[in-house]
Design a protein with these regions (language model features):
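N-terminal Lys/Arg-rich, disordered targeting/topogenic segments
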Residues: 1-21
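Membrane-embedded hydrophobic alpha-helical segments
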Residues: 14-50
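Low-complexity, acidic Ser/Thr/Pro/Gly-rich terminal tails and inter-domain linkers that flank the onset
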Residues: 47-74
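Solvent-exposed, conformationally flexible loop/turn segments
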Residues: 74, 137-142
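The feature marks short-to-medium sequence segments in extracytoplasmic or secretory-pathway proteins
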Residues: 92-137
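Internal, hydrophobic beta-strand segments that form the core of beta-sheet-rich folds
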Residues: 143-181
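Acidic, serine/threonine- and proline-rich intrinsically disordered appendage/tail regions
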Residues: 180-220
Length: 220
């Protein structure tokens, strides 16, 4: 008891206060670190599991076109499309629609995604295409396919929209199963020259004026 009393009597009040303050500050630091760890864990959970699907659409500088049949309004536009899901949740593409406008006449013709593959008359005769079907894209993943868009019905006019050399305006719209949001990308492509003989076997190219891809992403 004597030794304990001596230790108590010999304790410096300032030293006791310092030790108490140090413990309090240590507790605050531990609480702060725990809060930071919890925030990081929540952010990681959001990014990896909870973030809504975010579909980005990319179209390259060159696409292909053909009007292979006479006395018909059938036209085909081959567009290589890259889809990237920047979200965490799965996105399902139900359909793709392509609207093409001739800025000179203001006429617009609509097309639907029908097949995958490279268009040639030989492949058409043999049916060597993969039919378009709804596709799911997991979070943080991407896919690239060459999509063949065909004229959407006999009511679409004019019979041949793309004929005169010059620019044409395109709008590609995706329908997703997850909601009303429809990712879309608009772009212009130019037909440099027209030669119908190319359609006997293949297609004619249309080019981007600046040789850059188009996308629905916001550039800084």
């Amino acid at each position: 008891m004597g030794r304990f009393a001596d230790r108590v009597r010999g304790s410096d009040p300032a030293e006791i206060a310092t030790h108490g303050l140090g413990g309090f500050e240590g507790g605050k630091l531990a609480a702060l670190l725990s809060l930071v760890a919890l925030s990081l864990s929540g952010y990681s959970l959001w990014e990896t599991s909870l973030k809504q699907a975010d579909m980005q659409v990319f179209v390259p500088p060159v696409i292909q076109y053909a009007a292979p049949y006479q006395n018909s309004n059938f036209e085909v536009i081959a567009v290589p499309v890259t889809l990237t899901n920047e979200g965490a949740r799965t996105a399902t593409v139900l359909s793709m629609e392509l609207a093409v406008t001739d800025p000179r006449t203001k006429q617009t013709k609509r097309f639907y995604a029908a097949d995958f593959g490279r268009w040639t008359m030989e492949r058409t005769r043999t049916g060597a295409y993969e039919p378009f079907a709804p596709a799911s894209l997991a979070g943080r993943s991407s896919i690239t396919r060459s999509v063949l868009f065909y004229t959407r019905g006999t009511d679409q006019k004019p019979d041949q929209l793309i004929r005169d050399p010059g620019n044409y305006s395109f709008s590609l719209i995706l329908e997703l199963a997850e909601g009303a949001d429809k990712p879309a990308v608009s772009f212009d492509r130019a037909l440099l020259q027209y030669d119908a003989r190319a359609f006997n076997e293949g297609t004619l190219p249309l080019y981007s004026a600046d040789w850059r891809s188009a996308s629905n992403t916001k550039r800084e």
